[in-house]
């Protein structure tokens, strides 16, 4: 029996979700814990870090997934981490999530390859859509599929429509 395209796509998405890791870096413990809980309820595996340096020391970026990153943090800002990741050749798709909206920072992060730039408090559905797209792009990039890396940059410039 042949599966329909939507069923096959759902299985691929489920397989990606099962093996992906969503890394959350935020200096506010309440934010980290709330995001991690929401992601786990939605079936994602999440790991939290209190700052960028802890992430750089502890994380295994060989595992596919994405990064949900606060902008303003002590020790190393989100933008500084993004720059350090680029310097090291770490290609993990990054979603910035901040309570401090700044157009210059948003544009700068997107130009450097961020997948998305979202403002706290963020709608859970919008964040989940952004995470799913980022993870999918990471799997494509790792598989060497055309559009994996470019798909991230294209997606970063597309607005996400609210479902409210």
Label each PLM-derived region with a short phrase:
Residues 57, 79-90, 108:
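Short amphipathic alpha-helix used as the core "switch/output" element in two-component signaling
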């Amino acid at each position: 029996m042949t599966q329909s395209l939507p069923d096959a796509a759902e299985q691929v998405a489920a397989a990606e979700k099962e093996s992906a890791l969503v890394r959350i870096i935020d200096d506010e413990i309440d934010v980290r814990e709330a995001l991690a809980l929401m992601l786990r309820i939605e079936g994602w595996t999440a790991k939290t870090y209190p700052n960028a340096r802890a992430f750089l020391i502890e994380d295994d970026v060989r595992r596919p997934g994405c990064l949900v990153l606060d902008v303003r943090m002590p020790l190393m800002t989100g933008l500084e981490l993004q720059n350090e990741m680029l310097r090291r050749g770490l290609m993990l798709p990054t979603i910035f999530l901040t309570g401090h909206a700044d157009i210059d920072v948003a544009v700068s992060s997107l130009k450097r390859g961020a997948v998305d730039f979202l403002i706290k408090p963020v709608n859970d559905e919008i964040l989940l859509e952004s995470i799913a797209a980022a993870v999918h792009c990471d799997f494509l990039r790792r598989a060497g599929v055309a559009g994996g890396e470019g798909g991230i940059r294209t997606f970063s410039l597309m607005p996400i429509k609210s479902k409210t």
